Amino acid sequence: MEQDELRDQLVDPKSPINIESLLDTITALVNDCKIPVLMRMKSVDNFISRYERVVESLAALRMKAADFRQLKVIGRGAFGEVHLVRHTRTNTVYAMKMLNKDDMIKRADSAFFWEERDIMAHANSEWIVRLQYAFQDPRHLYMVMEYMPGGDLVNLMTSYEVSEKWTRFYTAEIVEALAALHSMGYIHRDVKPDNMLISISGHIKLADFGTCVKMNANGVVRCSTAVGTPDYISPEVLRNQGQDAEFGKEVDWWSVGVFIYEMLVGETPFYAEALVSTYTNIMNHKTSLKFPDEPLISTQAKDIIKKFLSAAPDRLGRNSVDDIRNHKFFVNDEWTFATLREASPPVIPSLKSDDDTTHFEEIETRDRDNAGDFQLPKTFNGNQLPFIGFTYSNEYSPVKNLLKGHGAGSKQNGIEQHKPQTVVEQPLTNGHASGVPEEKYEAVKMELDSKNREFELLKDSIARNEIRAKMIENEKNSLSTKISDLERELKDNKDKLRHGADSDAKVNELAVELRMSKEYNSEMESELSKFRDKCEQLKEDLRKKSGELAQEKNETQRVFQQKKDADEAFAEIKRDYELLQTRENEKSVQLKKALDERKENGAYQQSVAKATDAEWERKMQFYEKQLEHANDERKREEQKRTAAEFDQSRVARKLAGIEANYELLQNDYKSMKEARKDLERDLQDVITEKRRLEIRVEQLMDSRNTDERVLSLCQDELVESQEEAKYKEDGLRGKIDGFKHELENEKMKTQTLEENLLVADKERGMLKMEVQELMQRHKWEITNKDQTLKHLETQLDEIKQQSKIESSEQESNDKQTIADLRKKLDLEKAHKKAVINKLEEEMAKRQPLKKGEKGVTKSALIKKEREIMALEQERDTMSKRIAALFYENDKQAEHFNIAIQDMQTTQDALRDELKECKEELANRNVNTRYEDKRSLDSREGIPSSLSNQHIQMEGWLSLRDNTKKSRKPKWTNCFVALNEYSFTIYVDEKAVSVILLIEAGAMAHVRHVTAADLRNVDDSQLPKIFHIMYDDASCNSSRHASNSDLSMIESFREESWKRHDFQELSYHIRTFCDVCNKKLSDIIRPTPAFECKNCHFKTHKDHVAQGSLPMCRYNTGLSRELVLMAPQTDNCNKWVSQLRRFIESSRSAAVSVSRVSSRRHAPGSSNSSTIYQ
């Protein structure tokens, strides 16, 4: 009973003492103890000496990275990479995740890989990615998973415009995947489209379980860190950051709500460029969740999003997943949750091969860094111990082999059957004792081993051939189906094109080609049947030979056992015989001595000697009988030995027969391979022929559709076309005359209307070309319609005559025709439905984009259509108003001339005044009174510090576009100029069209950005980007501060924060403190830090407690932000330096500027910044 329990634990993959774990244990101990310091101890040195070669042998026999050929890198994370690999033995493609052990040990939650391994290995669900193998070496962990060639849902959203129908389908599948994960007792915590992979069939599976955590008996988890992607993280997780709190599986359902919103709208609902702003929106989700006008979202979709993105106690799915399944959003006529797996997915990925990676982003391949190996420790540290038991195999595992061996035999012989069944290993060790030459037995052993290996290879080859035969059969079935479809279409084409001689010829050719294809297909079927028969015959021969080989093995074992027993018995008899001879010699000597003593002692001794002699004679007789019996036994054993040698020779003869049969099997296998190659070539020819026939049928269908359209439309449009063409011609002539008159009048207009007139001229040219095209098209249509009308009249006469003849026959064929038409109608409906589904996919599919170019969304297309309609209306309105504009232009020209003269006069006066001011500035006495110290520039509202420092810089920068949220930012090139008066952004270097002007004194802050400020930006771009904050008095001047405080730390007063609105964050990307310039970030254990939600000021938590902070530069309600990128890092540093000088100079003159401004301008008459639309 205890042995059975122990055996069950050894073969149970979930047991901590299974065979794989024990092998990991001995390997880890040897690797951890093999250091010079420990090997000085004799016990450790003996342990290493005993097991070092054993571990090396285990490493060679167990699964390793060398068993897979790496094809491409398809994913990269902070702790490892995901490679596309191919198994060298089975030629199967997998995705292999490789993790660095050193990074795993340094990480705080280093046990995360156990959850990922256990979920994928033991999850019996079709919605979760399956683990095939897990193994390790001294440096890395490897997880080999099934390959999902369709990529992730992020790739699908960038390639297609996702509709609500598609969103419903994919949401239902992710609900089923999460339900399966929750039933195992785990919470995912990082549900997002990046972790939803598309299989070869188009269905999705959940992946990336590194963030999963096990729930307790109450279905909750206690955690103090915020884990997950910022855009998808739930508010209760953010609220309890840094505090030990409980939450359940409802955090995953929040992420599902964000996922639905992103699928429908194209962006996440709470997205913001700065991480702290994203967290603020999530915490204020009740007010920040808004739905755009475009695209249109149904009421059911909005309802399920709101229920998912609600407070944790009220969130949909908190009580049961059935509440989600019963929501009205999932009601449809195509599938239910019970039939979801069998339903047809919206998109099935198109693949060129089994290792196609077109649905994955291109990732640069990096060389492996050997610097991350474990450093040689000074004492035992057990680096390999945390990974004991990680190894797992779904197929090639000793556990599987033990289970198979145990199932084949009885419990008593189970241990013997579990041993490797190589050819008679133990009897061969006794070659000399049995009298058989050892060299002969070694040769026989090697022969049988080689035959075993060849036998296994032959079995594998036959299995692969069977798979290939099934593939050929499936291809044959698909060809048969397509040929039958072509026959149906050919029949329809014959019925519809029977009146045309050319069509009949084409149909006849197609029929001949189809008949030849069918004949060829039948030949292929006969070849395939012969191929199957050969495979079955070879399999039967293999079964027979394997049975004979097993019998021969048993017979050989029996013979060698008999030899061993005979040798042992012969040796024992020989020892007994020698012992008896020794005793007989001793007795003879004693007898001789006794006779001598009897002669010497007299009569008394003679009587005693007689009795002794009689006793010795009896003993001698007894020993002689035993000796004769031993001789008989020795003869019998020699006979047995002779029989055993005869049996051995018989086994050798049978082995020779097996070798001959094996050569025959090899020849059959070679012929079978050649036949398979011939079949593959024939199959390729059939596929080529099928494609040619499909092209032919498509051409015939196109010509048939064209004829049908002409016949159906000509009769209706023939009468109307002439009148419509005449009416359009008269109207277009009138328009041409009108545009000619307008063109003559436009030449007399002033310079201010030249741009509008140029647009009108272009429109006139376009309309003229359209008129000409319309005239030519209508003339051609009239000619074509006339010819068609004559042809139709001729056909009509022929049809009338023919109809009289066929009227009698038509009545009898009506019923049959109606039945045929109904069948055709059903077929056409099915065909149309398939075409509609395909068209939906093609219409949703986006065009391939160039690098850096954004796709056109449905909302953008709708906006473009509206803009086109608005432009058309504007064109009509403009044509109506142009006459009035011409009349008003003369009056306006006079006013413009007068205004220009006034402006020139004013400009000359200002120039003179500026010249006088500069002269007066040069003659100023520095030691005069304070009022006289002010420069003329200051009196004019320009800070003297700015004018004296000669701040001037210009160049090209890239302005970040914040109009639309997206995963990849969009940058717009612009020309920027900085002088002592303002900071101006122009459209181009001509400096005519102004985008933004920031005057002196309005600039509040400038700084370099970090990775925490801008997400989705390449690391190479970060040193080139800087952030500007400025005041805009034209905006709303409300100054109420934000009430949301995500950190929930109320012990700090607002006065000590210096108007900052802080959020507690943990930085895992490179970030520095703005107070002490020390690092805030760490990949493993980041230090506690704060970031201001307004000015993005970053600092250590200790600085906030000490109160050593500068004042927040953000003016609530008035401040605006800009993000600019320079071409080079040095250029960015120069811009930041000049802008800081600009800000410092404007602040030093703020008092004087405010006084001058109060004298020269009325309150509210000027703005600090002006934005030009």
UniProtKB/Swiss-Prot annotation:
It is found in: Cytoplasm; Cytoplasm, Cytoskeleton; Cleavage furrow. A zinc finger (Phorbol-ester/DAG-type) spans 1059-1112. InterPro entries: AGC-kinase_C (IPR000961), C1-like_sf (IPR046349), Kinase-like_dom_sf (IPR011009), PE/DAG-bd (IPR002219), PH-like_dom_sf (IPR011993), Prot_kinase_dom (IPR000719), Protein_kinase_ATP_BS (IPR017441), Rho-assoc_Ser/Thr_Kinase (IPR050839). It catalyses: L-seryl-[protein] + ATP = O-phospho-L-seryl-[protein] + ADP + H(+); L-threonyl-[protein] + ATP = O-phospho-L-threonyl-[protein] + ADP + H(+). It is an enzyme of class 2 (transferase). Its cofactor is Mg(2+). Disruption phenotype: Loss of both zygotic and maternal expression causes defects in embryonic elongation and P-cell migration, loss of only maternal expression results in abnormal early cleavages, loss of only zygotic expression results in sterility. Keywords: ATP-binding, Coiled coil, Cytoplasm, Cytoskeleton, Developmental protein, Differentiation, Kinase, Magnesium, Metal-binding, Nucleotide-binding, Oogenesis, Phosphoprotein, Serine/threonine-protein kinase, Transferase, Zinc, Zinc-finger. GO terms for molecular function: ATP binding; protein serine kinase activity; protein serine/threonine kinase activity; Rho-dependent protein serine/threonine kinase activity; small GTPase binding; zinc ion binding. Gene3D superfamilies: 3.30.60.20, Phosphorylase Kinase, domain 1 (3.30.200.20), Pleckstrin-homology domain (PH domain)/Phosphotyrosine-binding domain (PTB) (2.30.29.30), Transferase(Phosphotransferase) domain 1 (1.10.510.10). The active site is at residue 190. Residues 438-709, 735-928 form a coiled coil. Its EC number is 2.7.11.1. SUPFAM superfamilies: Cysteine-rich domain, PH domain-like, Protein kinase-like (PK-like). Belongs to the protein kinase superfamily. AGC Ser/Thr protein kinase family. Negatively regulates mel-11 to relieve the inhibition of mlc-4, allowing contraction of the circumferentially oriented microfilaments in epidermal cells and thereby regulating myosin II contractility during spermathecal contraction, cleavage furrow contraction in early embryos, and embryonic elongation and morphogenesis. Required for P-cell migration. May also play a role in oocyte cellularization. This is Rho-associated protein kinase let-502. It comes from Caenorhabditis elegans.
